[in-house]
């Protein structure tokens, strides 16, 4: 192999190594973001259940009437 070919191969290997590292970092970040999404989804589900429960309770509440002095 010529010196120029060896340099090109080394440059390609370095590029591949950097890309592999970047892919691994992005994969880790994506996994972390999915955890956050799942936590947010669980919170939203709990809030939705609570809201629906409160809404049902408010339907059963007596109607608000005006005091006699109005």
From Swiss-Prot:
<dbReference type="Pfam" id="PF04102">
    <property type="entry name" value="SlyX"/>
</dbReference>
<dbReference type="InterPro" id="IPR007236">
    <property type="entry name" value="SlyX"/>
</dbReference>
<comment type="similarity">
    <text>Belongs to the SlyX family.</text>
</comment>
<protein>
    <recommendedName>
        <fullName>Protein SlyX homolog</fullName>
    </recommendedName>
</protein>
